[in-house]
Every structure is written in C-alpha cells, then in structure tokens.
Amino acid sequence: MNVRQHKASFFSVVITFLCLTLSLNANATDSVLEAVTNAETELGARIGLAAHDLETGKRWEHKSNERFPLSSTFKTLACANVLQRVDLGKERIDRVVRFSESNLVTYSPVTEKHVGKKGMSLAELCQATLSTSDNSAANFILQAIGGPKALTKFLRSIGDDTTRLDRWEPELNEAVPGDKRDTTTPIAMVTTLEKLLIDETLSIKSRQQLESWLKGNEVGDALFRKGVPSDWIVADRTGAGGYGSRAITAVMWPPNRKPIVAALYITETDASFEERNAVIAKIGEQIAKTVLMENSRN
C-alpha cells in the first residue's frame, strides 16, 4: 500500500468512527425526545421538557421555551427566597408563624394539625410544603417573603426573566390555556434550579437545606423516582392543576457522577392523573437509560 492509499484508508476509518459516534449520540438523545412526543400523542397533551446532564453537558429540550403552569413547582422557589433572605440577614429560619383555622386553604395536611397551637417555624413550613405540598404552608411562606410579586422580583434578581407568580394558593393552579399568570418555561426552570441548587446563589448551608427538603418529598414516588434506578438520589417537587396540568422539577444524582437537572410540564389534556404520572415515570426511565448508556461507553 502506498502512502496515498494509507492516508485514504486512515481517514476513511476516522470518518466512519466519527459518523458512528455521532449516530449513537443522536439516537441516545432522540430516544428521550421520542418518549416525550409519544407521551404527547398518548395523552393528547402539550408537554414541555428541559433536562441538562451536568456530567456530559448533554441537553434534552422539547417545547422548552413554551409557557406552562407552574402549579406547586413554585414552592421550591419560594423556599429558596426565604433561604436567601436568611443568608442576607433579613430573616430567621426559626421565626415562628402563628395562624388560625380561618387562615387555611384547601389541602393543608400538616398545617391543619397546628391550628391553635404554638405555630410553625419558617423551616417547618418549608419542610411541610416541599414534602407534602401543603398549600397553606406555601401561602405562609409567600407572606414571609412579601407575596407573589416579591417572589417574581427575587427570580428577576437571579437572572430568571421568565418565571412569574401572580396569585396565591389555590387560585394559582387554575392553568387556563394561554394565561401567562403563574407560569414558567421548562428551560427557565432548569436554569433557575441550577442556580439555586448547584451554583452559588445561596450559601452552602442554604443549598444543602433546600436539597434536603426536596429529597424528603413524600408525593413524588410515582413520577421520576419510579422511573430511575433505586440507587439514584432524587430531589424533586411536583405539581398539578387545572386542564390536566401535571409537573415535576428535579435534580437527580446517579452514583459517583454529577446530576441531571430536569423540568417536565404537562397541560391541556383529559388524561387521568394516573396516566399522566405513568408517562412522567416513563420519560424519567428513558433519561436514566440514556445516562447509563453514556456511562457504559466511558
């Protein structure tokens, strides 16, 4: 074989390898997005996904710049705002909030047990709303930071120009199609979650506290947690609202690697609660399969 033939053969091998690698990566990425589009068809829904693998830099996005109802995923942001105020010396996490039965709204499984007693600290209220999605606890947290507009102002201050909260629980869950109130986009939420739980927007202590509350979520077992391997650590917040809205935001740590940050929103569907939960679990499973496939190659 002469030099020219040798070079041609070498470049042919290189090009074939690169094409195969790109093809495998594309197929891995597309399998997640295919799961989302299949879910849209199955549910007759509008679904938005943004996910970022911080280990590899891989991203998955589907309708990631479209607005979706926040529902209870705002509760992570509200508690992060409290923690930032604590970091700045403007608030105490042990400050006690007292309330009566007249202050409660629908679905208050924790706060209803504390009516007429000594009250609950801001830390206890955040734990209640992030673990059980207690709506009254969320409203008390909103009161502590200055209301929905104050939360939106906090988000603008950390670079989120998209997410907005306009109302209180439970009205914010109305989720009328086309209404921009109380909405976010999947990509905005993922970016904000990274700032709050990964970057240095909050102190280390506050990041660890927020992460701990989210890991203690008691109402997310049928969603991403069901779809990913049992040895993954998941810190998540779920949500549900009108017009078939269902949501989950999560940071998921596979063993011995950086996490995946994800936001998945479903709306405008007549599918049952169980059907919506099932497709979220299925999408989470596909993300996990793709990540594990990447790990096996490295």
Curated annotation (Swiss-Prot):
Keywords: Antibiotic resistance, Disulfide bond, Hydrolase, Signal. Its EC number is 3.5.2.6. It catalyses: a beta-lactam + H2O = a substituted beta-amino acid. Substrate binds at R237, T238, G239. Disulfide bonds join C79-C126. Residues 1-28 form the signal peptide. PROSITE patterns: BETA_LACTAMASE_A. One of its GO terms (biological process) is response to antibiotic. One of its GO terms (molecular function) is beta-lactamase activity. The active site is at S72. Hydrolyzes carbenicillin. NCBIfam families: bla_class_A, carbeni_gen, RTG. PANTHER family: BETA-LACTAMASE (PTHR35333), BETA-LACTAMASE-TYPE TRANSPEPTIDASE FOLD CONTAINING PROTEIN (PTHR35333:SF3). Belongs to the class-A beta-lactamase family. This is Beta-lactamase. It comes from Proteus mirabilis.
